[in-house]
């Protein structure tokens, strides 16, 4: 610790920080353009100049380390004049197009010029202009506005690991670009827009739509992957009304215009993936609407609470009254919260059935204890890793922020990452050993010389993908992983060395609720179609393989409960439900933390939540006794369940049990776990922006994933 004097005030700071960080810790604001706390120091904008006693000229505070008994001044006439001169220099070639710039109202250059700049300009020469670059469907460039802060270059090389952006030219001919014409191909490209302090990089889907002061902001949780980052959803009220018989029935709900990252407590990063940021426009395309005339009339006459009862009557009437029975099943897609899964499970249980699962294939995983279906550590604790073994997992596309954190820790500490599985460019320095189970078995038997010392490392860990537990030989893979886990845990009683990564929230919520599909057996894969369902519910399903669910001999009444319509699915009836932006709810993330979803936008259609639909359906079945109070008690039950999970011991030796395998232990290759990052759920499949990203950024693969 060092003692400093800042503006005649004595403070104590750490010896490892810069002058700028010391000033901020003391509460003094220092303007900057190039400096960012998550990036390396560049020091080329010169906006953060401060005066230091006994220094002949102003000092760049972001690049100057603190020293003992240093005396710093941030508001002297010398500092003010220097900042004014720097701003005048930066504005020499900057265009005067603030009225049409999407950055207007949120522009750092506007704010700094107002606070520290001059009220007049003295430049009368020709301004230079720079040709705009084509970076893809996400980023719109107006390069004449660029002030060469190099934030975008440092982000792409340090955070993403993509060495495509750089600066070239000298003096007034300096430009930032991709050297040769190319798109910025990364799943984190939208963060470049947030980093740009001026309007040089703006969001192409958001272009010319609104101004920042017109937006209403709400905080919620991202639900497109298992990390569940904190996000800020910006909406705008619509002035259009729905009119019927010269009466205003309802005001059209809010419209989502933009999603930005909030401060993430998990990884302490302010990044989100492009799918989390831009997939919301899928709710505008092929959105299901509830055109129940009788229901709308009841809303006007009885009010919103009583309309739920009439909702059940109308639903029953609209879908010709399917009778629920023991032969009732449900398949849940990747975007379903705890309430939806909980009430779907209760619904199937009341019907007397057991057939409920996520996707077309059942996972061969043990849901009895948190240790077997959780990451078993926080993302922030990744800095304690020495060696990480990644088994059949594409961290870049299954958990983008997890991959970013792994890269950051590798850059800072020179970590070793070992991958076994389908090769993919994770933007990590990795040793890829092979693509089959043979490699994993050899490693578990200590037959790989390269990894002989892995068991002797202080803290080796294993991450593997939930998706690989759903393939035909998932049970065999679980056996090998459990054998390897038992070997690694021989000398340390900790559960942090073995973790499973879920790519979607539905599988996490299933696991935490302890819901297991069908018979408790790993052999339960293809027998489900012999059930001959009378009624089958598809909940937010992005894919449905009828040959795995339905018997050709028997007709099944199929009902799709979804926010959007997928033309490739086969169903008898479509029932609209609310999206997770339009309701309050709960979900678990990969750390096992219970997160709360907040309603940030109202539904444009008359859709209700999934649990309301199922409750209404049960309400009007003659053979079942169901009360509406069960819905309102859900929050208490979930809180109790989460508290129970915390009390379960995370590690026990006798839980390393092995599955019985009907087939011989033969080698099989790891299939790619993500076929298309941009089109991976029912909302993104309907997103125009995600469709363009998939067209420009994805590569075709002939690898058969259905094995």
Predicted regions and their residues:
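AMP-binding (ANL) adenylation modules
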Residues: 39-40
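Glycine-rich N-terminal segment of FAD-binding domains in flavoprotein oxidoreductases
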Residues: 28
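Non-catalytic alpha/beta scaffold blocks inside enzyme catalytic domains
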Residues: 360-646, 706-707
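Acidic/polar active-site rim loop that often engages polyanionic ligands
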Residues: 64-72, 594
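N-terminal export/assembly segments and adjacent metallocofactor-ligating motifs
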Residues: 1-24, 32, 36, 51-55, ...
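Acidic, Ser/Thr-rich low-complexity intrinsically disordered segments
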Residues: 646-676
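N-terminal single-stranded DNA-binding subdomain of primase/primase-helicase replication proteins
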Residues: 45-65
């Amino acid at each position: 610790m060092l003692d400093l004097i800042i503006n005649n005030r004595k403070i104590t700071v750490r010896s490892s920080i810069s002058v700028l960080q010391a000033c901020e810790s003391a509460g003094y604001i220092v303007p900057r353009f190039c400096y960012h706390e998550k990036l390396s120091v560049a020091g080329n904008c010169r906006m953060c100049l401060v005066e230091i006693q006994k220094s002949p000229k102003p000092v760049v505070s972001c690049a100057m380390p603190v020293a003992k008994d240093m005396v710093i001044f941030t508001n002297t006439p010398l500092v003010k004049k220097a900042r004014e001169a720097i701003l005048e220099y930066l504005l020499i070639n900057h265009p005067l197009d603030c009225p049409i710039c999407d950055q207007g109202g949120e522009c750092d250059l506007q704010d700094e010029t107002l606070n520290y700049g001059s009220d007049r300009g003295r430049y009368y020469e020709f301004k230079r202009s720079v040709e705009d670059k084509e970076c893809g469907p996400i980023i719109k460039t107006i390069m004449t506005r660029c002030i060469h802060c190099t934030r975008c270059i440092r982000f792409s090389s340090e955070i993403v690991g993509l060495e495509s952006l750089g600066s070239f030219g000298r003096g007034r001919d300096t430009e930032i670009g991709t050297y040769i014409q190319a798109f910025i191909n990364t799943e984190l490209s939208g963060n470049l827009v947030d980093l740009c302090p001026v309007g040089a990089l703006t969001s192409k889907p958001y272009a010319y739509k609104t101004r920042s002061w017109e937006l209403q902001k709400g905080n919620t949780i991202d639900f497109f992957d298992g990390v569940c980052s904190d996000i800020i959803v910006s909406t705008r009220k619509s002035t259009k009304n729905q009119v019927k018989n010269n009466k205003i029935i309802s005001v059209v709900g809010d419209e989502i215009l933009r999603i930005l990252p909030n401060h993430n407590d998990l990884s302490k990063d302010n990044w989100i993936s492009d799918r989390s940021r831009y997939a919301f426009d899928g709710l505008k395309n092929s959105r299901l609407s509830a055109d129940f005339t009788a229901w709308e009339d009841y809303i006007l006459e009885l009010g919103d609470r009583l309309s739920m009862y009439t909702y059940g009557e109308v639903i029953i009437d609209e879908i010709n009254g399917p009778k629920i029975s023991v032969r009732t099943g449900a398949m849940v897609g990747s975007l379903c919260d705890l309430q939806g899964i909980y009430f779907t499970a209760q619904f199937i249980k009341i019907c007397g059935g057991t057939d409920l699962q996520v996707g077309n294939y059942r996972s061969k995983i043990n849901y009895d204890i948190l240790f077997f279906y959780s990451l078993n550590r926080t993302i922030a604790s990744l800095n304690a890793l020495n060696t990480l073994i990644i088994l059949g997992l594409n961290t870049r596309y299954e958990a983008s922020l997890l991959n970013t954190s792994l890269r950051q820790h590798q850059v800072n500490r020179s970590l070793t990452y070992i991958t076994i599985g389908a090769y993919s460019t994770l933007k990590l320095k990795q040793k890829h050993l092979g693509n089959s189970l043979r490699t994993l078995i050899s490693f578990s038997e200590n037959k790989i010389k390269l990894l002989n010392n892995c068991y002797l490392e202080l803290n080796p860990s294993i991450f593997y993908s939930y998706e690989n537990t759903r393939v035909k030989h998932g049970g065999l893979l679980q056996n090998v992983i459990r054998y390897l886990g038992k070997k690694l845990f021989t000398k340390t009683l900790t559960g942090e060395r073995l973790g499973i990564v879920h790519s979607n929230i539905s599988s996490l919520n299933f696991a935490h609720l302890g819901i297991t599909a069908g018979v408790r057996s790993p052999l339960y894969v293809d027998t489900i179609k012999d059930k001959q369902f009378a009624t089958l519910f598809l909940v937010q399903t992005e894919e449905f393989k009828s040959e795995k669910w339905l018997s050709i001999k028997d007709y099944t009444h199929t009902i799709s409960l979804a926010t959007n319509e997928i033309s490739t699915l086969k169903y008898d009836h479509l029932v609209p439900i609310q999206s997770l932006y339009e309701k309050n709810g709960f979900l678990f993330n990969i750390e096992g933390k219970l997160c709360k979803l907040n309603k940030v936008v109202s539904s444009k259609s008359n859709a209700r939540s999934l649990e309301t639909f199922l409750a209404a359906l049960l309400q009007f079945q003659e053979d079942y006794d169901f009360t509406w109070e069960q819905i309102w008690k859900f929050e208490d039950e979930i809180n109790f369940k989460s508290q129970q999970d915390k009390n379960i011991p995370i590690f026990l030796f006798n839980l390393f049990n092995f599955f019985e395998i009907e087939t011989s232990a033969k080698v099989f290759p790891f299939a790619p776990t993500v076929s298309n990052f941009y089109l991976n759920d029912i909302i993104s499949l309907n997103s125009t922006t995600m469709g363009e990203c998939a067209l420009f950024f994805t590569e075709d693969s002939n690898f058969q994933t259905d094995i």
